[in-house]
Amino acid sequence: MPTVDVVDLNNQVVSSVELADDVFGAEVNQSLLYEAVRQYQASLRAGTHATKVRREVSGSGKKLWKQKGTGRARIGSVRSPLWRHGATVHGPQPRDYAYKLPKKMLLGALRSALSAKVRDGELKVVQNFNFSDHKTKNAMGALSKLEAGRTVLVVDNEDNRNLELGIRNLKGVTLLATREVNPYHLLGHKSVLISEAAARKFSEALAK
């Protein structure tokens, strides 16, 4: 089991915690990470794109000129796809891009993402995030002491109003509960600050 130092909000080591080896020390599966990120990004797509078919395009349905005798090409309606400002044939229509991955794949991708962060030294276990108040200035100071990068993912296992209010206006900082964490979030932030309680929760929930 990998042993990780636990620091306080002043970045001083106060203890250590043993984390599950198959959660925080697993082999990183790049293919699983790719599939998990692709699935999450697909779920974010609005899918509101739309083109107009003949029945939706503005314009008369009257035949512009007689079928024969003019020497011109025959035409039925200005809404024809052949005409400028006419309809679109086989164009995109609103759709839902979301799809599901097997639970086993998602859990495996989460283990890979956590293990990659530990391997690269980008995950830090914090004793707790018990701020004395909800001031953004104090939250920013704590993150600075913890040597957080430009993009930071903060993971806590419990409701923490002071933490939520303190960091919500900080650019590049995201707060999530353990149940909300996705491989996309872990890989999308340079630093991950995780509370000791949340680390233990991951070890219990994701252990094989």
From Swiss-Prot:
It holds the Pfam family Ribosomal_L4. Gene3D superfamilies: 3.40.1370.10. GO terms for cellular component: ribonucleoprotein complex; ribosome. One of its GO terms (molecular function) is structural constituent of ribosome. GO terms for biological process: translation. Keywords: Ribonucleoprotein, Ribosomal protein, RNA-binding, rRNA-binding. The keyword Chloroplast does not apply. SUPFAM superfamilies: Ribosomal protein L4. InterPro entries: Ribosomal_uL4, Ribosomal_uL4-like, Ribosomal_uL4_dom_sf. PANTHER family: 50S RIBOSOMAL PROTEIN L4 (PTHR10746), LARGE RIBOSOMAL SUBUNIT PROTEIN UL4M (PTHR10746:SF6). One of the primary rRNA binding proteins, this protein initially binds near the 5'-end of the 23S rRNA. It is important during the early stages of 50S assembly. It makes multiple contacts with different domains of the 23S rRNA in the assembled 50S subunit and ribosome. Forms part of the polypeptide exit tunnel. NCBIfam families: rplD_bact. Part of the 50S ribosomal subunit. Belongs to the universal ribosomal protein uL4 family. This is Large ribosomal subunit protein uL4.
